Amino acid sequence: MNHLDELDADIPRPSYLKDAEAHIKKFGRIVATTGIRPVPSEILERLITRHISTDWGDLCIEDRELNDLAFKNEAGGRLLSSYDDAFDGKTIWIITSGYGYDPDNVDLCHTTIMFP
């Protein structure tokens, strides 16, 4: 451990930051399909932020309700976000499988960014 690590460990972390990190961890490992490579990272970051903030994008009411239920239960549900015309006129999907199932085991939960 270097000196900076020791200093950082001594700084108390605000509870809201701990809560945010715990929330983000419930989305598991974030991965993308190879087709997403041309999409600028700024766009991907914005879409991921929307997804983890429960802005599901361009979904029908039924899919929104399913997302809201899975998000509320945190019991391994699926979350889908669809963002029309997100890049080059194309829709981008972000799908979280196993949301909140076991935040300490990222193999059980992951979020994938892809074109439909």
For the regions a protein language model found, what residue spans apply to each?
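Compact soluble domain cores
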Residues: 5-81
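Short intrinsically disordered terminal tails
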Residues: 1-4, 115-116
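Short, compact, well-ordered microdomains
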Residues: 72-116
